[in-house]
Amino acid sequence: MTKQIITLVGRPNVGKSTLFNRLSIRKKAIVHDLPGVTRDRKYTDGKIGSFEFLLIDTPGLDEHPNSMGERLIEQTTKAILEADLICFMVDGRSGILPDDKLLSSFVRKYNKPAILVVNKCEKAFDFDKEYYKLGFDSMIAISAEHGTGLIDLYDEIIAKLPEEESIKTNIADPIKGDCLQIVVSGRPNAGKSTFINALINDERLLTGPEAGITRESIEIDWQYKNNHIKLIDTAGLRKKSTITKSLEKLSASDTINSIKFANTVILMIDALAPLKQQDLNIASHVVNEGRSIVIVVNKWDLVKESEKEAFQEEFYYQINTHLPQVKGIPVLFISAINKQNIEQVLDACLKIYKIWNKKITTSKLNEWLNFTTEAHLLPLQKGGRRVRVKYMTQTKTRPPTFKLFSNNPEKITDSYTRYLVNNMREAFDMPGVPIRFIYVKTKNPYV
């Protein structure tokens, strides 16, 4: 039996994301006092008491001046249809507003079990008749921020969804295990959410022409060719100098944190926007974090056929020039909106993930090391003795990391290290992943 689903619904800024984080087994949502922070429905494993469930956070619904309002309603409707129980949230400080009344009617028409959750009740709270007029038979007052009232909420949830029907499973660790975590990153409006929607064949994420629609990292569990994949859509990363609002700073921090714990990062680039320093900065950050990377140029269908060859030539030149430390990064040209070449992206991710996890035997490493250092000798030290790398071994994967033992590691130049790394990349077929060398001084300086 699968876990039962609880969906949080309400107008903006009533505290849905705060309660989402409070009930989640790990923090997921950005919390900010600006209305409308959440724009997609988000899923997490939740727990209250001994009762485990799947929890959905939804966008705050209000009157939007453009087409985004319809898209937000669509996201919320899908979450309501999935739900076994709805927690309809209102703000106990501001009281019942016209939007609350409209939304309660919208929710009740689906005839789902529901609880009215009055949030931000740090002090004793009395329900007046306005709350009863919303039409819910179960009401509870809580403070999601301070954690008060959660025992009462637990009792109400159990009354609606008996505890014995839940499955008390252990939640998989988000980083370890066989789940491949793929983070989709890039500048705003590159088509990251459109790409994920095309992959999973569902309008799971809010998309549109407005830059910056995605404001926080959204995780989606998915299966591809018998591989368990977690797709993570992130907020677009702007230059630091252009990030002025505190919400954007939170979104950028959330994106950077997602990259830190990714297995593979897809760097999405808009074919209609020239490759900029910010794209290269993001790629460098991914590499510095030791993640594997796949570069995807989206909106390829909008580039004129006569210009594509020159575009690719210049693009590869820029990548190879500015990211020489990771030669062979996979680059794919796609159209997310037309679903052109999108599966090739996942195939590239699976391939580079295997390289990122590659383990090389010590015997093969040292056979390669002897041949490579003899072909290009290290410099002489004072006194005529040559700098040598005597021995090496692989200490870890993800990324491949090697320890090299030398009689004088301080004399090994960066250019010689690049020579070794590039030679290793070719010899062991390791394109596009960071390779790290750690030099250790041997106890005997004469070896």
Swiss-Prot record:
Any Gene Ontology biological process: ribosome biogenesis
Keyword Transmembrane set for record: no
Regions crossing the membrane: none
Keywords: GTP-binding, Nucleotide-binding, Repeat, Ribosome biogenesis
Domain KH-like: 358-443
A Pfam family matched in the record: KH_dom-like
Domain EngA-type G stretches: 4-165, 180-357
InterPro entries, alphabetized: G_ENGA, GTP-bd, GTPase_Der, KH_dom-like, KH_dom-like_a/b, P-loop_NTPase, Small_GTP-bd
Ligand binding (GTP 2): 186-193, 233-237, 298-301
Alphabetized GO MF terms: GTP binding
Binding site for GTP 1: 10-17, 57-61, 119-122
Gene3D superfamilies: 3.30.300.20, P-loop containing nucleotide triphosphate hydrolases
Function text: GTPase that plays an essential role in the late steps of ribosome biogenesis.
PANTHER family noted in UniProt: GTPASE DER
Subunit details: Associates with the 50S ribosomal subunit.
Protein family according to the UniProt entry: Belongs to the TRAFAC class TrmE-Era-EngA-EngB-Septin-like GTPase superfamily. EngA (Der) GTPase family.
Protein's recorded name: GTPase Der
Species in which this protein is naturally found: Rickettsia africae (strain ESF-5)
